[in-house]
C-alpha cells in the first residue's frame, strides 16, 4: 500500500469525548469515526486490524473442528418468545416490527437461531457432535455506550455453538475451545488470563471468561498466589472466616447520629473501625417469599456482590434495590439509618457479618444508630450466605494462597449451556436407544472488535499504538526521505516495497511529499512495528536505518541485507 493511494486520516489532537486510551488512539490513528452513540464506521486502517484478528480467530476455529455458517442479524420475535428470553433479556434487546406488523429483534446473540436451525437439520445422535461458528455483527442497545468500540451498541463478534448427546462430549468440545481461545490470544501476543465466571443472561452451568489485563478494564479479576485459581470477582467465593466470633465486651446502646447517613460519615464522626460496622441493604423479595423486601447485611468495608445476591431464592430477579419511598413505607426510616435490630423483614447476613461482635448499625430510626450489637444476645443470627465481593488478602476459594485483584477487559467467554435452550425449543435427536433425546449445547464467544481496543490498551505509549506483529495494519513502513528529489532513494524504496510484497509482507510505502517529522509521527501513531528509513546520506555507505516501534532503538542495516533482516524480525 502507498500512502498516496490510501486514506490515512490521522489526527494530532486528542478528542475531548474519548475516555480511554484505546478510544483516543483509534480516533487519532484514523481507525474509526463515530456515526452515532455506540455506532462506528471502520476506516481502512481499522479494517486491516479487524481482518487480521478475524483471520486468526477463523484459523483457530477451523483447527478446532468448528464449521463456519452465517446467520441473519434480524431475528423473528417468536424464537425469542419460545426460548423465554423475550421477557428476560431487557431493554438491551432492540425490538421492532416490519411493514406487516410482524415483530423482530436485532440479534445480540444467536442461541435461538442456531437451535432452530439444528433442530430442523439434525435428527440422529450419529450426526453429533457438531460445532458451528460465525463472525457476525451484533447489536445490543446499551443504556450508556462508552469507551469507543469497547462498549459499543453495534459490534463484531465470533460466536460458536456446539451440539452433543452427552455431557462428556460437551466437555471435550468445551476443552477444545478453551485451548483454541488460548491459542488465539497467544498468537496476538496479548497478556490474558482465563478465569471462572458467572453465566449471566446466557445461562448454563460451567463458564470461563478470557480477560486481557489492563488498568482500564471494567472487570475485577482475582488470582491466587498459591495456585492457578482465577475468577471474575462476580464469581469468586468469599470463604467464611476461620476465626470464631469474639465474645461481647460492650453493652447495646442507641446513639444520636444526625449527620451520619453513610458508613464513611459514621466511621469519621465516631472513630469506629469500619470493620466494626454493618451495612443494611433492602432489595425486592421474590414473590413466593410472602414479603415485599428482604434485608442483606454486609460488613461496612465490604461490597455487596449483586450476582451472588440475585441467585438467592429469597431475592427477586433481576436484583432491584428498594427506593427510599419503599424503605420509608416499610421501616419508617431512611436508607442511611437501617440495621438488623428489631427489623421486621427477612434478613440474610454475609458470612463475615455472622462472626462480628460489638458492631454498629442503623437503629431503623432517622438519625440514630445502635452500637455494641451482638448476635444471640441482641438479636437472633439470621440466614447466613456468601454475599460479598472478595478483597485482596482473602484466602483463595481453593484454600491455596491468598487472592490478588487486577483489572481486565473481557474479550472471550465460553459456556456449557446444557439443555437450557434445546429443551424449551424441543431440539431433539434420536438417541442410541431409539428414543428422542434433548441435545446438550455449548456456546463460545469472542468480541472481535473489542479485541482490537483491548490490544491497544496493552500496547501503546505517548506517541501512539504499538501493535503486535500478528495484528498490525502494516508490518513494515518504508519511509524514504525526499524520494521525489533523489532518484536512488526512490529506486531503493520501490525495489524494497516490491520485494517485501512478494514475500507476503504487509508493507506501506510513505510516498507523500511530507516533512520527515510528519511521516515518522504518523507511522508511530498507527503503530507499524518495523520501520525502514531511507536517506541519501546513509546510502553513501549503502545502509538504511531500521527502527523497532516497540523497542525504540535504531540500527543501521546494509542495503543488501534489509529483506533478510526484516524477515528475521517479523513474527509470522
UniProtKB/Swiss-Prot annotation:
It is found in: Cytoplasm. Its EC number is 6.1.1.15. The keyword Membrane does not apply. Keywords: Aminoacyl-tRNA synthetase, ATP-binding, Cytoplasm, Ligase, Nucleotide-binding, Protein biosynthesis. Coiled coil: none annotated. It catalyses: tRNA(Pro) + L-proline + ATP = L-prolyl-tRNA(Pro) + AMP + diphosphate. Gene3D superfamilies: Anticodon-binding domain, Bira Bifunctional Protein, Domain 2, YbaK/aminoacyl-tRNA synthetase-associated domain. It holds the Pfam family tRNA_edit. One of its GO terms (molecular function) is ATP binding. The keyword Transferase does not apply. GO terms for cellular component: cytosol. GO terms for biological process: prolyl-tRNA aminoacylation. Transmembrane segments: none annotated. InterPro entries: aa-tRNA-synt_IIb, aa-tRNA-synth_II, aa-tRNA-synth_II/BPL/LPL, Anticodon-bd, Anticodon-bd_dom_sf, Pro-tRNA-ligase_IIa, Pro-tRNA-synth_IIa_bac-type, Pro-tRNA-Synthase_IIa_type1. Homodimer. Catalyzes the attachment of proline to tRNA(Pro) in a two-step reaction: proline is first activated by ATP to form Pro-AMP and then transferred to the acceptor end of tRNA(Pro). As ProRS can inadvertently accommodate and process non-cognate amino acids such as alanine and cysteine, to avoid such errors it has two additional distinct editing activities against alanine. One activity is designated as 'pretransfer' editing and involves the tRNA(Pro)-independent hydrolysis of activated Ala-AMP. Belongs to the class-II aminoacyl-tRNA synthetase family. ProS type 1 subfamily. Consists of three domains: the N-terminal catalytic domain, the editing domain and the C-terminal anticodon-binding domain. NCBIfam families: PRK09194.1, proS_fam_II. This is Proline--tRNA ligase. It comes from Yersinia pestis (strain Pestoides F).
